[in-house]
Amino acid sequence: MTDAALETRGLSKSFGALSVASAIDFRLEKGARHALIGPNGAGKTSFVNLLTGALRPSGGTIHLDSADITHLAQSLRVKRGLARTFQINTLFRRLCVLENVTLAIAEREGVAGALLRPAGRHRAIIEEAFSLLETLGLADAALQPVNALAYGRQRLVEIAVALGLAPKVLLLDEPAAGIPSGESGVIVTMLERLPADISVLIIEHDMDLVFRLATTITVLVQGRILIEGPPDAIAGDPRVREVYLGDRKR
């Protein structure tokens, strides 16, 4: 078996008697499009916080590209190639789209503060940022302030900023959250354009988006993995319908 892009072994987290993650063995393959779903309170956010280092585990290990990152600081996990978007938009809303992505790339390169001073290297960073926007279909909005964009496009910019960090693994935390149903298609289109070598874990409540994009789905319930498999198997599993997809027998 090849090395996973991201893997947990026996990952656990408890707050006193409350267990939010119970011995989770999870594997994100390289280049995968993998979704994590589950009802409210299933432990999805806690699991992602453990992956990113926002929470310290009570037990178990986390490996990123075979390296043990269990006790690594959040900032160092980002530098190792683990990037996350958030449910709540965290962009610099008064800056233009290009500036937001440029700042992310500059942070990755360790020259964020130096952007205030002109230098040839800064031009290369700006060119990289614009090229990324072109790839993702956002070049037309490059010079627009983020707060002038529709909310759906703001979420696209958030993904572009995460990609500016050059991640090996991208954690998409509810990318469709707060987006009107008529705008969710732009999220799908952009995610379909993501580079194939980036491993993607999507945490999402929008089942249409999940089943369109993911080739593997993990269902989390009460801090444990209930089932994992391809979309057809998940959609047809009676346990999933009962706890999550709304087909509870009466």
Task: Please tell me what each predicted stretch does.
Residues 2-250:
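Glycine-rich phosphate-binding loops of nucleotide-dependent enzymes
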